[in-house]
Amino acid sequence: MNIDVLTLFPEMIEPVAAASMLGRASKNGILKIRAVNIRDFTQNKHKKTDDTPFGGGAGMVMSAQPVFDALRSVDAQDKRILYMSPRGRKLDRDLVTDLAAEENLVILCGHYEGIAQRFIDECVD
């Protein structure tokens, strides 16, 4: 299984991926986890990834552009794309069993008040 994790904090993913059962699965070639830093795909000199919501409202959301570009970098075609958010489906045993059958996953870690809805509508499974 190959898992690409799109995140603003890749330094948090790498130690977890190397520890315990995940680490053993990686060493045995069963699992490959790659952390992708969304900030690497911003088009401004300050590596800014947040913006105000398009329709207005409180808080900031992750800008669609760097997330779209990060997703393109992992060749997400034929990969199931998950967005981790408290608004979505609960991650329970049934969902984990379903996901374990996938060959390739992309996990997008949310931040701020969420992510631009345009990205969710176009890309998330």
Per-region residue spans from a language model:
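Generic recognition of short, well-ordered alpha-helical segments
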Residues: 16-20, 94, 118
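Structured adenosyl-cofactor binding patch, chiefly the S-adenosyl-L-methionine
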Residues: 115, 119-125
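N-terminal nucleotide/polyanion-binding subdomain common to many enzyme families
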Residues: 1-74
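Short, solvent-exposed amphipathic alpha-helical segments in soluble enzyme
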Residues: 20-24, 97-100, 122-123
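S-adenosyl-L-methionine/SAH cofactor-binding core of RNA-modifying enzymes
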Residues: 61-111, 116-117
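A general secondary-structure boundary signal
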Residues: 2, 103-104, 125
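Conserved beta-strand scaffold positions in the cores of enzyme catalytic domains, especially
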Residues: 33-35, 81-83, 125
